[in-house]
Amino acid sequence: MKHALGHGRMSIIAFSIAMISALLCGPGMSLGAEAPRPLAPPTALSLREARVIIDGAVAYAREKKLRMTVVILDEEGQLISADRMEGASFHLERFAKGKAFTSLILRDRTETAAELNKTRPDRYFGIMNMYPGEVYLVGGGVPLAIDNRLVGAVGVAGLPEGVDEKAALAGIDAWNKYRDSMKK
């Protein structure tokens, strides 16, 4: 007896293998037909650079005998690295991330945004509604740029008012020194 798919049992097996291959590989592909895709290019801000920023900010906080959390985001708002100093509260990571995210989307220091928000609270209404619970209009978030190109942001939380940004700037200063040393 002949099957609708061909002349006997082998055609059914071949058809089954082809169907399984199509399901495993996706449409328009077969096993071994396509070379592996290259890895995505690394972010402009490397993990090593993020750690340099964090280490600079942590050194500043230690010098002042303070505890804090610091977060580094890439240009798309994705986490590169974060540190919570021993004894710093667990909720500070979210706060630091919110500050970094806010400085990233505003392309400005969150301390500047906080000052502008005092005189005109409606200024950031749209962005706060677009990102509910993610925008923090308090100091401690600073954008990161290389050759005037935004590459990420740093956010610091847990320090007294005005000191968060100083810690972030200390981290950025350490990063700038690191970048300068790499050029030599």
Task: List the predicted regions and their residue ranges.
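Bacterial N-terminal signal peptides
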Residues: 11-28
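N-terminal secretory signal peptides that target proteins for export/translocation
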Residues: 1-9
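Flexible, solvent-exposed loop/hinge segments and secondary-structure transition points
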Residues: 31-184
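A periodicity- and composition-biased signal for non-globular, repetitive helical segments
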Residues: 8-9, 15, 90, 105
